[in-house]
Amino acid sequence: MIWKDYFVSIAEQVKEKSKDIKTKIGAVIVGKDNEILSTGYNSFPRGLNDNVVQRQERPEKYFWFEHAERNAIYNAARIGVSLKQSTVYLTSGLPCMDCARGLVQSGVIKIVCKKHCTTKNSGKWKESQERSLILLNECGVEVEFY
């Protein structure tokens, strides 16, 4: 099994921890020696009551859920792990603009993601993802689609 397939399969497992009833996204951030530095999935912030049904419904959920990519960044920061020169493997398409900026600023140099947005509400993210690709290209972050 090649590394890409290995880490994507781990991200697929990580996403299953999400309590989002409609969309599950996973992220695995890996160092230059193929060591796992951090993982993340879309979720409510730590300590927030995740049993409030209204927080699961669109558009309300967009105020409450954190994205997998940013959760992986925050998880690394909480334990003092540098993400400099790392690669992130996603179970989704391109990250949104907010996540793309976070990945760039945290030192990620490569993103491996699906060619197309796979969320049920992909239209909401199209414009953000188009801009994030421009940002990633200008900032020298390699994008590999699978």
Indicate residue ranges for each PLM-predicted region.
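Zinc-dependent deaminase catalytic domain
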Residues: 1-146
